[in-house]
Amino acid sequence: MQLTGHLLIGQSAIAGQNGTLHAIAAATGEPLDPAFGGASLHDLDTACALADDAFDTYRDTSLEARAAFLDAIGRHIMALGDELIERCVIETGLPRARIEGERGRTVGQLALFASLVRDGGFLDARIDPARPERKPLPRVDLRLRNIAVGPVAVFGASNFPLAFSVAGGDTASALAAGCPVIVKAHSAHPGTSALVGRAIQQAARECGMPAGVFSLLFDASREIGQALVADPRIKAVGFTGSRRGGVALMHIAAARPEPIPVYAEMSSINPVLLLPAALDARHDAIAPQFVASLTLGAGQFCTNPGLVLAVDGPALRAFEEAAAAAVRAAPAQTMLTPHIHASYEQGVAALRDHAAVELLAQGAEGNRLQARAALLATSAEAFITHPELRDEVFGPASLIVRCPDADTLHRVLKSLEGQLTIAAHLADGDAPLFAALRPLLERKAGRILVNGFGTGVEVGHAMVHGGPFPATSDTRTTSVGARAIERFLRPVSYQDLPDALLPEAIRSGNPLNVPQRIDGVPAPREANHV
């Protein structure tokens, strides 16, 4: 499939005229062909008009048709074959095996939402039958279902060019909910974005979906992204990226005459707690596992373990020595973009030069675009006193906080902002301490894990990839897993409508055979007769 640099607006490919951008080869810093034309405000208006026109038609497609569309997107992504993998490797500097794994995750995510749509449980169908005999007043007939909120704007992420980008979790869950999607592609991988966008476009055409169900825009500046969030036809936003970028979009959305939600996944340092019994027994085993997680993908994971908390003593110092040795042996790695690399170097330098911080180790040197892993340490009092030590450094750097006792460790945890993950390493003797800490961990993070690291995010029904601000903008939500669909739904209640005028999901007899609750009680999936 030849890359043209065109915008994808509905079923059309249009040459953008508002400036140009080139992908940059991550390993060399050289620009890549073709040039991608930036969208104009007119292009944005066209995409939003198409999405608005498509909304009612698309949200009323049958569950099977919508699920088949999601499955078709996955098939067309797989059909891109090596072309997609090779372009993605060049643009991002990520290894081929990582990209192949991420492609599988992306397609699997689409399949999960297709299964969710076919089941129909996301509709949350509820029926409170009329009770005309109730005294002193009769009860009306009330029925409820979820509907799609409207067209959704999605901002692709830099660090997951497939799974959090054009056909990533935000797009998949919004399409599953019945929302048309307009994606603002990330400038770090426009070629990858264009290939995946064409796959979605082809799937939409194959499945007979309305033209405006999907559009892909490139932006040579920030103008189009900001205008997209401000457009009154957009009803929700999905974003994965920096705290600064997410907060800027939140402000734009809140300032609209009709404010809308921005579901932004932003900043997290993902503390790792090394509890005393585990640290005594397994420090030599935990250290290399920690460094492997820290350096995975050049540390460019939103769940990267950027903070280690432990009670100081011989076991912690032994852990530090083992981890420092592993860091020194870690090869330098290419980062996603020169800008990300420069930001990482600045973040490490700020920590290294801080009077209260000790540099324990750095990884092997590489070229000018490659990142060296870094391990640093500080005291608990310094960490609590200096809020700048709690800033995220995006990349393979982690700060160890030495706590004099468990009470101080608790104080350090209390000083933290919201997190995506908190990992605790514990042995049998640590159970009482963990039990005492768990209420605080629940207040601070969206996912709590034991004897592991947060860098693996399973796509499933029980996953939460979210957390209190600034991990995300809305602590009630997740951007990964089945519950991600809930961000793009809203409930509608129907009172005393004749059965023939009700949506099928909440009709008597349950013609769609979807899960229903009658008077709050799950009803049998076979047709019922209310």
Curated annotation (Swiss-Prot):
Q: Which domain of life is it from?
A: Bacteria
Which keywords are on file for this protein? Answer: NAD, NADP, Oxidoreductase
Q: What is its EC number?
A: 1.2.1.26
Q: Which reaction is catalysed here?
A: 2,5-dioxopentanoate + NADP(+) + H2O = 2-oxoglutarate + NADPH + 2 H(+); 2,5-dioxopentanoate + NAD(+) + H2O = 2-oxoglutarate + NADH + 2 H(+)
Q: What GO MF annotations does this protein's record show?
A: 2,5-dioxovalerate dehydrogenase (NADP+) activity
Q: Which residues bind NAD(+)?
A: 184, 241-246, 392
Query: What induces the gene encoding this protein?
Result: Induced by hydroxy-L-proline.
What are the catalytic residues?
A: 265 (proton acceptor), 302 (nucleophile)
Entry's Pfam families? Aldedh (PF00171)
CDD domains, A to Z: ALDH_KGSADH
Q: In which pathway does it act?
A: Amino-acid degradation
Subunit structure comment from the entry:
Homodimer.
- Which family, according to UniProt? Belongs to the aldehyde dehydrogenase family.
Q: What role is this protein assigned?
A: Catalyzes the NAD(P)(+)-dependent oxidation of alpha-ketoglutaric semialdehyde (alphaKGSA) to alpha-ketoglutarate. Involved in hydroxy-L-proline metabolism. Prefers NADP(+) to NAD(+) as a cosubstrate.
Q: What is this protein called?
A: Alpha-ketoglutaric semialdehyde dehydrogenase 3
| Species whose genome carries this gene | Azospirillum brasilense
